[in-house]
């Protein structure tokens, strides 16, 4: 059984064969129209028009990249030519100096003579020597560096009001004003007869209580209240009656003989 792709291909071949039979040889010259444009072709076609702002920018960038590529190529070719010329000159100089004495390595220009004493101006331009005006720092002392102070801080430092506004301080507690001695008219509950007779009328008696010893059973009952509770657990009992006692004899029972009759 053919697959789906094979069946589709076979149907296309059959359709093309039928059209060839109908139209004959004119099929090859038939105008099928314009090919369907893919997104890439559409974008390139839009970039080729100068009416679009994006297309103009694209052309400018393309020209700039081409210019950079050509300039870079010229620079590389020029550098290669200079390198080849230098190599040829070196070979010529080497061939001329084969019989002569070898020269030492050439020193770059503006190099100070090592035999002369070093000049601070040559070593570090602008350096005139060690600072002699400032005394050396003493041992175990810290030099306070000068810090930058903005004009705003200088203006605030001269005005105490601005300084207090910038660095607020906590409010100090104000002194309490002395209260005036007012007479109180609040009513107080007074006992009958006045406060003088209240001590005689009101009497309090301490209640009597009895101290229990540790060995007292009442104290033990209070200490362990579960000890005096009634137990409802059932104890196992035998198959005996509670009212009638059962007498068990150990004497052996005698076999009662049955008298035989005369007929037997």
Curated annotation (Swiss-Prot):
InterPro entries in the cross-refs: MYOZ
GO cellular component, one term: actin cytoskeleton
Function, in words: Myozenins may serve as intracellular binding proteins involved in linking Z line proteins such as alpha-actinin, gamma-filamin, TCAP/telethonin, LDB3/ZASP and localizing calcineurin signaling to the sarcomere. Plays an important role in the modulation of calcineurin signaling. May play a role in myofibrillogenesis.
Alphabetic keyword roster: Cytoplasm, Methylation, Phosphoprotein
Annotated positions of the Phosphothreonine modification: 107, 111
Domain of life: Eukaryota
Organismal lineage: Eukaryota, Metazoa, Chordata, Craniata, Vertebrata
Protein name, entry field: Myozenin-2
Quaternary assembly: Interacts via its C-terminus with spectrin repeats 3 and 4 of ACTN2. Interacts with ACTN1, LDB3, MYOT and PPP3CA.
């Amino acid at each position: 059984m053919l697959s789906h792709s094979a069946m589709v291909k076979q149907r296309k071949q059959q359709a093309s064969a039928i059209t060839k039979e109908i139209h004959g040889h004119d099929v090859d010259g038939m105008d099928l129209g314009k090919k369907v444009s893919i997104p890439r072709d559409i974008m390139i076609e839009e970039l080729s028009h100068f009416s679009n702002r994006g297309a103009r920018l694209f052309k400018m960038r393309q020209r700039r990249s081409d210019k950079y590529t050509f300039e870079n190529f010229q620079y590389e070719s020029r550098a290669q030519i200079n390198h080849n010329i230098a190599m040829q000159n070196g070979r010529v100089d080497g061939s001329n100096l084969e019989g002569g004495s070898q020269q030492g390595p050439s020193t770059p220009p503006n190099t100070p003579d090592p035999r002369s004493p070093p000049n601070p101006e040559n070593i570090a331009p602008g350096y005139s020597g060690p600072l002699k005006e400032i005394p050396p720092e003493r041992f175990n002392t810290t030099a306070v560096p000068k810090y930058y102070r903005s004009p705003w801080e200088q203006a605030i430092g001269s005005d105490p009001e601005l300084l207090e506004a910038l660095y607020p301080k906590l409010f100090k507690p104000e002194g309490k004003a002395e209260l005036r001695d007012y007479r109180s008219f609040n009513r107080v509950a007074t006992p009958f007869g006045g406060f003088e007779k209240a001590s005689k009328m009101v009497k309090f008696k301490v209640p009597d209580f009895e101290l229990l010893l540790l060995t007292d059973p009442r104290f033990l009952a209070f200490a362990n209240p579960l000890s005096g509770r009634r137990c409802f657990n059932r104890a196992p009992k035998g198959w005996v009656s509670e009212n009638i006692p059962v007498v068990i004899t150990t004497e052996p029972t005698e076999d009662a003989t049955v008298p035989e009759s005369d007929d037997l």
